[in-house]
Amino acid sequence: KHQTFAGILMSLSIVGGVISGGFGINGWALVGIGTLIAGVLSIVADVLRLRPSGPLFYIFAFMATASVPFDGQLWEAALTGVASVGVALVLGFMGRLWARRTEPDRQLAEAPLPAWSRIYAQAGRYVVALGLAGSIGVMSGLGHHYWAMVAAAAPISAVGASGGLVRAVYRIIGTYAGVLLTAALLTIQWPPLGLAFLIAALQFAGEVFVISHYSIALVFMTPVALMMTEFVAPGPTGTLVADRALETTIGAVIAFFVILLTTRKQRAQERSLRQTQTN
């Protein structure tokens, strides 16, 4: 059920991004629309209790597809999104069947619905952080301001306020290492099929580390985003990696301070809980 809802939101985000790009929406208008979508989808994701939580992946899909040229038809983008979601759902269902065979007595309890005050507060953090990050990205003149918005969304989506602060720092460290790896990989002229296998391998490595070592995961996941961008809209490698590093710094720093300034009570509760568990 949760995967289905997430797949629907992802497909709608892709289609919405393609439509926005087709109308030539960019700059300030795109930042405004993306910020509004992030706030709304934050509420939707929390109400549906989706995991990973928050609008991070949906806003990334929307902003990325809206920011690059698309010469195909809308139905092609929609079909690609729906087909990808379908494959993911089938794989998820197969995993569920396997789990029932290997762990028949295991029951997965659904997470409780958060308090509405917390849901609205979290949505507000996304709106403030992404709005500021996108605005600074536009004013800076860098070429991919939505990267700053994605970098701002990632720490806020972390479990716990303290975890969000740590993730903001890890986001910067991992991205810096990732852009160095990207620069090295882009010295090679990859054929389309070779690039597809490389991206799949990097994505797999990123998923292996994303839960336990977030900064290491970004070393592999950063080249995925940048090499796909380079494939769709080629440009100077130096500009590409510099934009990624700078805009990630903008977004992560903004997220750090938004979390720091709006979660004082929550962080105190987390510290108290950790002390209780330790004792």
What are these regions (language model features)?
Residues 1-220, 228-279:
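Alpha-helical transmembrane segments and their membrane-interface boundaries
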